Curated annotation (Swiss-Prot):
InterPro entries hit by this protein: Cystine-knot_cytokine, TGF-b_C, TGF-b_propeptide, TGF-beta-rel, TGFb_CS
Name of the gene: nodal
Species of origin: Xenopus laevis
GO MF annotation, one: morphogen activity
Lineage, broadest ranks: Eukaryota, Metazoa, Chordata, Craniata, Vertebrata
Induction (UniProt): By dorsal mesoderm-inducing signals including smad2-smad4, activin and other nodal-related proteins including nodal2/nr-2 and nodal4/nr-4. Shows autoinduction by nodal/nr-1. Induced by vegt, acting in an autoregulatory loop. Beta-catenin potentiates the response to activin. Not induced by wnt8 alone, but wnt8 potentiates the response to activin. Suppressed by ventral inducers such as bmp4.
Maturation-removed propeptide residues: 19-281
Subunit comment: Homodimer; disulfide-linked. Interacts with, and is inhibited by cer1 and gdf10/bmp3b.
Protein name: Nodal homolog
Length: 406
């Protein structure tokens, strides 16, 4: 972990922005150690350009670093957003921004949101210039996919003051989006017209909802005016979600499924690695790996005892570096070695494994030897592209913590 932290600090030295603050509070500029970037330009949101011209929000990169280094106080202080309450963070840039007097219309493509996800927190982050005047604004939010029918999500009033510190303004839109998640509609194929959703939204008792746009103010998909104070690069919706327990892990976007469906995977490079074959979820894949050497303990027949050894996974070597932003490599560890007969508590055997070792001692031809396997695993937080969006997700059972015999 110390090595990973050091790598992250070097990687983020020139591309970081301050920690987020609670909605309706002006952000304080708090760059990471070694940062030399003044974050007051919308263009900085693009991050470093990849050779395939991909972009990622710097906010997502810092959120990833905060989680890995344990500096997650910014989220822990927010209501209902303890670190353990979410396992996925999805960032969505606005697809379109339009303006009609003091009414702003923001459109997002939420097709990447899984039906099995439960919304924990939704933040609308808007980058405003220092010269932005103070006046009341009504913001209408829509889901729009490929310029097709528009799904009205909700509206709220905002009065963003002139900012003297960070130009970022953060709004908590969780209550506005919760009905959309609870409907459990297939957003890839089912769309409601803006007028229908607006009429339904206006009747909600939620204080964060305001009256729906009137007939003369309804969203016009052909409207071309762009707000003076923002553009799509400076408007981002950040969704903190958790897979519902009722989903029973069916359809959960595992790393294997994400890799198989990613358009950024280097198939040609991966095909050159010998011996690659597919496994079930939660099992390590047989990729090109670098194994470190650890001093061995020996038993009577000369074989080392069951122990944990290094297994460095380098995503560049397996053709995954194009879609995985961080980490570029990590130590997954693995288990190898012999299990003594009979077993003892040092190797954390189950009762069944212990009895199996006893039978093996007295009847060696009857059963096979216990196997050296992982008995404790830990998750790995990963920042990567899922389709055209950037996702921060905690993948379970990615690192071997302890080995034992079973």
């Amino acid at each position: 972990m110390a090595f990973l932290t050091a790598v992250l600090y070097l990687g983020f030295a020139c591309i970081s922005q301050g920690l987020p603050t609670w909605p309706d509070r002006v952000e304080s500029r708090n760059p990471l150690f070694g940062s030399r970037v003044a974050l007051n330009l919308p263009s900085l949101l693009d991050g470093n350009r990849h050779h395939r011209d991909m972009r990622y929000p710097l906010y997502m990169m810092q959120l990833y670093q905060n989680l890995v280094t344990g500096n997650d106080t910014g989220l822990a202080n927010r209501p209902n957003t303890a670190t353990k309450e979410y396992d996925t963070v999805l960032s969505l840039f606005a697809k379109k921004c339009t303006e009609s007097e003091n009414r702003w219309t923001l459109s997002f493509d939420m097709s990447a949101v899984s039906r099995s996800n439960e919304l924990k927190l939704a933040e609308l982050r808007i980058l405003l210039p220092h010269t932005e005047p103070s006046h009341n604004i009504t913001m209408d939010m829509y889901h729009s996919r490929d310029g097709e029918d528009n799904l009205y999500l909700g509206s709220f009033n905002a009065n963003p003051p002139s900012t003297k510190g960070s130009p970022w303004k953060v709004f908590n839109v969780t209550k506005i989006l919760q009905p959309y998640f609870k409907e459990r509609r297939d957003i890839d194929s089912e769309h409601l017209k803006a007028k229908e959703r607006a009429e339904r939204g206006s009747g909600m008792s939620n204080a964060e909802f305001i009256d729906a746009p009137g007939p003369s103010q309804q969203y016009n998909p052909h409207q071309t005016s762009v707000p003076t104070y923002l553009n799509t690069k400076g408007v981002m919706l950040v969704l903190f979600t958790k897979v519902k327990s009722s989903a029973n892990h069916i359809g959960f976007p595992s790393l294997i499924k994400t890799a198989e469906s990613s358009k950024y995977v280097d198939i040609e490079k991966a095909s050159r690695v010998p011996g690659i074959r597919r496994h079930r979820r939660n099992r390590n894949e047989n990729h090109h790996l670098s194994i470190g050497s650890i001093p061995s303990r020996h038993v009577e027949n000369g074989k080392p005892l069951c122990r944990r050894v290094d297994m460095i996974v380098d995503f560049e070597d397996i053709g995954w570096s194009s879609w995985i932003v961080y980490p570029k490599k990590y130590n997954a560890y693995r288990c190898e070695g012999a299990c003594p007969i009979p077993l003892n508590e040092t190797f954390k055997p189950t009762n069944h494994a212990y009895m199996k070792s006893v039978v093996k001692l007295y009847q060696p031809e009857r059963v096979e030897c216990p196997l050296c396997v992982p008995v404790k695993m830990s998750p790995l937080s990963m920042l990567y592209y899922e389709g055209d969006e950037v996702v921060l997700r905690h993948h379970q059972e990615m690192i071997v913590e302890e080995c034992g015999c079973s």
